[in-house]
């Protein structure tokens, strides 16, 4: 059973090892090699059983192992490797439906109990036996240019290539970026581009599963014909040092995805009928800005970030993030004991509480079908008897909760302990979302809105 690639992509990026991002901002190659490891757990809250019409109310549990290696070739270049091994288990949603016949808006009342007579929204789920594995592998190189007598500009540029593989999915990608510093390193300009080719081969194909597995693995119409997607992205940014304690930055990006029907979720089928159809392309624009403010007297740094997102599916979102980084350095005059040991070996601790708010509007084709409409759709599928046709949804339509209007809040805490050339890092995050936290359509039904807990722990070692 296919999992939510977009969600996992989003989850993986949030957990990414920090080495590459940090080095990309430097103008001289690091002098030491670095190896890092992260173990992460991601656990979604179950859906209220009263809202589940068919299938399991369990959601995804994801375990992620990440590896990072950086090695200097000389004073001006490094090579890198990043690898990920991920396992997933749980149940996947097919669609959301109204239980009334005409699909009208549900009655807004105070009860949380599912009752068909109140037109509450229900969710059709798969069984809870989904088991998936994913492997990512990327290699890269980065080159550094220092300031010289002939040129005041300094910077770096790099590229990486790799793949992401699952039993039914393969993505090949390349990316490159560069940055240059000017005005005595007060101004930094950056730009980059990436390209990915994804191939989907949904399994099992229609008619190849036995009765025991059928509820967990519905048939896969159209997948053998339309299984390619490309993704092209460009970005540009500028960073400015305002004074010794304040840095601001701004970035913009544009991404275009094309996929005939790959952008459609082939795994959203119910009783043999497709219940998901999306446009053949998706254009996405982002603008982000951030501030880093140091307070030297407190050994503190404040991070504030804002991100605007728009796409031609009708989704518009805003994200605001705030974080406080507090550093504690052990400085002791003791001649012996644990405090003396930590002081002599440069032991330091960093804690970083953070909060984030997010809201988005719904895609123009987001809708919740009525049970009657789904039944009619299934009947049309069976009557047509053509597994290679894609005409049962005559217009774009999806009940994917990621395309609904909602808002989200998350809070987390990071921790870092440094000892000589070793650093232990950990963080956790609690996330909740609902239409009531959003700005538009706050009274809509979204019983499958995402809630999750995530933690990460790992080590970095320089040698």
Role assignments for model-derived ranges:
Residues 24-70, 447, 454:
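Short glycine/proline- and aromatic-enriched beta-strand/turn motifs that initiate or cap beta-hairpins
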Residues 39-45, 85-89, 145, 161-167, ...:
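Transmembrane beta-strands of outer-membrane beta-barrel pores
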Residues 47-54, 93-98, 164, 169-177, ...:
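Outer-membrane beta-barrel translocator domains and adjoining extracellular loop/strand segments
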Residues 48, 84-137, 188-247, 252-258, ...:
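Outer-membrane beta-barrel translocator/channel fold
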Residues 58-59, 130-135, 163-174, 281, ...:
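Solvent-exposed loop/turn segments connecting transmembrane beta-strands
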Residues 67-71, 139-143, 176-180, 236-240, ...:
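Residues on the lipid-exposed face of transmembrane beta-strands in outer-membrane beta-barrel proteins
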Residues 77-79, 147-157, 184-189, 245-248, ...:
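Repeated loop/turn-to-beta-strand initiation elements of outer-membrane beta-barrel proteins
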Residues 449-463:
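Outer-membrane beta-barrel "beta-signal"
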């Amino acid at each position: 059973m296919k999992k939510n690639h977009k969600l996992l992509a989003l989850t993986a990026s949030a957990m990414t090892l920090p080495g590459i991002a940090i080095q990309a901002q430097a103008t001289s190659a690091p002098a030491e090699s670095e190896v890092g490891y992260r173990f992460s757990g991601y656990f979604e809250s179950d859906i209220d059983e009263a809202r589940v019409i068919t299938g399991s109310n369990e959601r995804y549990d994801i375990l992620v192992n990440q590896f990072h290696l950086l090695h200097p070739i000389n004073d001006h270049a490094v090579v890198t490797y990043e690898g990920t091994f991920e396992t997933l288990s749980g149940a996947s949603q097919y669609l959301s439906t109204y239980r009334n016949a005409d699909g009208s808006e549900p009655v807004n009342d105070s009860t949380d109990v599912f009752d068909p007579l109140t037109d509450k929204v229900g969710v059709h789920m798969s069984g809870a036996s989904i088991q998936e594995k994913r492997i990512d592998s990327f290699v890269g190189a980065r080159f550094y240019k220092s300031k010289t007598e002939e040129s005041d500009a300094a910077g770096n540029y790099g590229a990486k290539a790799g793949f992401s593989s699952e039993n039914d999915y393969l993505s090949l990608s390349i990316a490159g970026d560069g940055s240059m510093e000017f005005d005595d390193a007060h101004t930094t300009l950056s730009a980059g581009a990436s390209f990915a080719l994804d191939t989907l081969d949904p399994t099992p194909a229609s008619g190849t599963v036995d009765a025991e597995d059928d509820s967990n693995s519905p048939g896969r119409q159209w997948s053998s014909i339309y299984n390619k997607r490309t993704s092209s992205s460009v970005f540009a940014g500028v960073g400015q040092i305002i004074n010794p304690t304040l840095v601001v930055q701004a970035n913009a990006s544009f991404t275009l995805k094309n996929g005939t029907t790959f952008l459609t979720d082939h795994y959203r089928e119910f009783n043999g009928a497709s219940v998901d159809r999306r446009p053949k392309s998706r254009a996405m624009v982002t603008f982000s800005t951030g501030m880093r403010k140091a307070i030297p007297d407190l050994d503190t740094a404040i991070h504030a970030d804002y991100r605007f997102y728009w796409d031609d599916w009708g989704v518009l979102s805003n994200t605001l993030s705030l974080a406080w980084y507090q550093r504690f350095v052990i400085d002791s005059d003791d001649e012996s004991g644990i405090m003396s040991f930590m002081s002599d070996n440069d032991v330091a601790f960093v804690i970083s509480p953070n909060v984030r708010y997010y809201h988005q509007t719904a895609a123009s084709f987001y809708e919740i079908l009525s049970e009657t409409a789904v039944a009619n759709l299934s009947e049309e599928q069976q009557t047509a008897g053509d597994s290679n046709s894609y005409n049962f949804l005559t217009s774009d339509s999806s009940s994917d909760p990621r395309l609904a209007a909602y808002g989200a809040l998350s809070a987390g805490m990071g921790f870092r302990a440094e000892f000589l050339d070793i650093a232990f890092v950990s963080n956790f995050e609690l996330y909740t979302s609902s239409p009531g936290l959003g700005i538009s359509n706050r009274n809509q039904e979204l019983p499958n809105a995402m809630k999750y807990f995530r933690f990460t722990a790992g080590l970095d070692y320089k040698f």
